[in-house]
A protein has these predicted regions:
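Generic alpha-helical structural element
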Residues: 9-12, 100-103, 107, 141
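Glycine-rich, aromatic-bearing surface loops/beta-hairpins
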Residues: 114, 135-146
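Compact, glycine/acidic-enriched structural inserts
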Residues: 94-128
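Short acidic/polar mixed-charge low-complexity motifs
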Residues: 79-81, 91, 101
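Generic alpha-helical propensity signal that fires on short helical segments
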Residues: 30-34, 38, 91-93, 110, ...
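Generic structural signal for residues positioned in beta-strands
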Residues: 73-74, 91, 113
Length: 158
C-alpha cells in the first residue's frame, strides 16, 4: 500500500477493503472516468478520497448530521449518482441525493467486480461490440436487488 493511501485511511478512520486497495495501488484513478463514473478530478486519488469525505471549507458534506457514517466513504461520483464503499464488508452502493437511505441500492458485492463491470461496458462501447445486458452484469457483480438492476440498466444503456 502506498503512503498516501495509508494516510487517507488514517484521516478517514477506515481500513480500505482488500479489493479496493489492490486496484487503487495498481491503477492511478486520479483522472479516471468510465461509464459516467468519475473517480478523481486530477491529481492524487488518495487526496481526492479525503476531500470527498471531509467537510469542505463551506461546511458542505454528503452525509446528514455531524459525523460521517462509520465505514462509509464516497469513492466516485457520476451524474446523478454518488458511489459509496462500505469499508466493513466491501460492498458498493449507488446513492441518489433524494434517497432516504444511504445503502438501499447495493450495486456490487465488492470494488473489483464493480470496476470490472464498468470497464467491460466501457470497452464494449469503445469497440462497438454488444454491451452486456444488465441482468448479466447484476449477476456477475452480485448486486442486491431490483434497485441495483435499475442502476445497471441505466449504466449499460448510456
Amino acid at each position: 500500500m502506498r503512503t498516501g493511501d495509508k494516510k487517507a485511511q488514517e484521516t478517514l478512520g477506515v481500513k480500505f477493503p482488500l479489493a479496493f486497495s489492490r486496484l487503487v495501488c495498481k491503477f492511478d484513478l486520479g483522472e479516471f472516468e468510465v461509464c459516467n463514473v468519475r473517480f478523481g478530478v486530477g491529481g492524487n486519488y488518495a487526496d481526492e478520497l479525503v476531500r470527498l469525505n471531509c467537510t469542505d471549507e463551506y461546511g458542505g458534506k454528503w452525509w446528514h448530521g455531524d459525523t460521517r457514517p462509520a465505514n462509509l466513504i464516497v469513492f466516485a461520483v457520476g451524474d446523478p449518482w454518488i458511489f459509496l464503499l462500505d469499508c466493513a464488508d466491501g460492498a458498493i452502493y449507488a446513492w441518489l441525493l433524494g434517497d432516504e437511505e444511504l445503502c438501499n441500492r447495493r450495486v456490487a458485492s465488492d470494488f473489483e467486480r464493480f470496476f470490472r463491470a464498468l470497464a467491460s461496458v466501457g470497452i464494449a462501447r469503445l469497440s462497438k461490440n454488444a454491451v452486456p445486458c444488465a441482468e448479466e452484469i447484476a449477476k456477475f457483480v452480485q448486486a442486491g436487488d431490483d434497485k441495483a438492476l435499475e442502476f445497471w440498466r441505466e449504466t449499460a444503456g448510456i
